[in-house]
Regions:
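Extracellular and organelle-lumenal recognition/adhesion modules and their flexible linkers in secreted
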Residues: 1-131
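Juxtacatalytic substrate-recognition/specificity segment
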Residues: 136-232
Length: 232
């Protein structure tokens, strides 16, 4: 482990096939429907680039199946790397967090499952406060990596007000509201494959790996252009 003690080790040799193997821990006593972050220190080796999701953290939410940390590939046994994943707690104040090699589903564009070796230590969970830029409207909550917020708080408030209008229009069109009528949540995430701009669910995952987030805010700041494509 980090200080010479024990840690979690998951290993899968290529000759045994790709895997999605994780160590799961159930959490209780969380505030219901609030954003939390799980941290871990990680070392890893021999994980082929873009083969599945590699070494990852994720939670077992049934409202957002695809949420995860960024994916780690290759070999890094010299230093412990920090890894984190954000997730919404369940309505009963619980969550199930997983330290894994490969993902729980194999149906992702990179196959989900992986081979190699990964070590996890110093796993902790905190409620998100200033780790993310957070703002909300009447029907939408926003959780964004601060370095990617290129618009002012006022401009984002106006954007959220427009998203609220779109929410009401969708509700009128469909005759129903998603997720039992609770506010939509939009969460920027590095745990998406390169082919995805965003993924539907609760929360909606908005890829911060490339320019999806920054370009939206740049257009908002420079031209007042606002997008509602995230409400899919």
């Amino acid at each position: 482990g980090v200080n010479g003690g024990r840690c979690i080790k998951i290993q899968q040799f290529p000759e045994n096939g790709k895997c999605g193997v994780g160590i799961k821990q159930k959490l209780t006593g969380l505030e219901p429907d609030q954003l939390y972050r799980v941290y871990a220190k990680v070392k890893y080796s021999d994980i082929p680039q873009d083969e599945g999701r590699g070494a990852i953290l994720f939670d077992m939410s049934q409202k957002q199946y695809w949420g995860a940390s960024k994916f780690l590939y290759g070999t890094n046994l010299k230093n412990w790397t920090s890894l984190y994943a954000d997730f919404l707690s369940q309505d009963d104040g619980t969550a199930e967090i997983v330290c894994a090699l490969g993902f729980r589903y194999g149906g992702t564009t990179n196959g989900g499952y992986s081979t190699g070796t990964v070590y996890f230590d110093n796993v902790s969970v905190v409620k998100v406060t200033d780790e993310l830029f957070m703002q909300e409207g009447e029907h939408v909550r926003l959780f964004i990596e601060p370095s990617q917020v290129y618009a002012s708080a006022k401009q984002i408030t106006e954007w959220l007000a427009n998203l609220d209008k779109m929410y009401l229009s969708y509700a009128e069109l469909m005759g129903a509201t998603p997720h039992d009528g609770r506010k939509l949540a939009i969460l920027s995430s590095r745990g998406l494959e390169s082919s995805y701009w965003a993924l539907a669910g609760y929360p909606i995952l908005w890829s911060s790996n490339y320019s999806a987030v920054t370009s939206t805010f740049e257009e908002l700041a420079k031209h007042g252009t606002w997008s509602f494509g995230l409400m899919h």
